[in-house]
């Protein structure tokens, strides 16, 4: 059992099934704080995984922005559009952006982000590369365009909100932001925990699944 102090109540309006997105929404919220996005900016989110789509979902609410989600898997278009987001493959990219959020987890995605950043743009790196080394073209337009590469990591409260919001407050806000039925398009399943071996085999053959829900108690 976890100590009561470590628990966070799920808002009544948020179904248990959707609440599994809490950690991803908290990460997306932190990305938006690190991005320090402004009204009217041109934005790209590179990588249409759960975190990338949730970050785009939050950033697109800022007035006057033009935001496009970029992913090489054209099958992600349907999910992005279900969230009301513009989608493009790398070949269809609309051009340079003032803010680029990179969430593809690939070196190629980060290089794409750098190549599509406008003068004085910010590239927020939201991926996790572990101990892998990543080769980047920092000797080309990176200096002449005065680009800024910003690390975003959920272990600390991001940006100007650090010192003003606790981790508990950030999680509570993330949970409240899940009160949106459109987010159900990110979910697959559910499956029973006892069926997990067969479920994992099926998911391995279906790379387009974003977040599969597993129930420990089938009646939940």
Residue spans for each PLM region:
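Structural detector of well-ordered beta-strand residues that form the stable sheet scaffold
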Residues: 1, 44, 68, 122-124, ...
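C-terminal substrate-binding/catalytic core of Rossmann-like NAD(P)-dependent dehydrogenases/reductases
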Residues: 136-187
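Glycine-rich cofactor phosphate-binding loops and adjacent beta1-alpha1 units
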Residues: 78, 83-150
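Glycine-rich phosphate/adenylate-binding loop and adjacent beta-alpha elements
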Residues: 1-8
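C-terminal hydrophobic helical "lid"/dimerization subdomain
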Residues: 165-220
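Glycine- and other small-residue-rich loops at beta-strand/loop junctions that grip anionic moieties
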Residues: 20, 44, 48, 69-70, ...
